[in-house]
Amino acid sequence: MNAMDSQSTQINMEYQFTSDRNGITDKQRKDVSAILDVSARFKIFINDDLYFDQAEFPILEFYTYLYNWKKAIDQSKRAQEFHYYTLEFDEYEDGAILSIIPFGDSARLKSIWAEQELYHVFDLDYLIRAFLTLEKDLKRDIEAYFPIKLDKFIKHIPAVVFDWNR
């Protein structure tokens, strides 16, 4: 794939909460099982092709990974790999549920749960901006839908800790 093709690769991410609006409250911020039960239908389209589709995706846990990744980018002032794993699944020999793999000024999106194998190369800045926008939108929408403040939850939501590139 040449550079022109990578410039035209587009990503679209959609989510719809599947958990009850009152399924979690600020009082449950330390309840890991309640946190993991909060789910959404999460889809990723690459150039209008369905790439990733999970009906009961643990959205608070995923948000935590995005939040930690955003912090690592802010602190290091450079692009970082992103890898999402869930506590509910433990077979990762083939990789993470979702990964952003940067190389040069480009990046790939990879998933062990992909609906179909698509090998698309993205502009690195474009893909990072798309996932940082997703983090911001998720925070806004989670707090609007559920009666919680993520700032109170974030330190209690389990997540794998990575050694970020400095």
Set out the residue ranges of the language-model regions:
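Short linear sequence elements within intrinsically disordered, low-complexity coil regions
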Residues: 20-22, 89-90, 151
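Short linear motifs in intrinsically disordered
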Residues: 25-36, 73-74, 96-102
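Compact, well-ordered interaction domains used in eukaryotic information-processing assemblies
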Residues: 55-94
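An exposed acidic His-Trp-rich patch
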Residues: 80-126
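Mixed-charge, glycine-accented linear interaction segment located at domain edges/termini
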Residues: 112-166
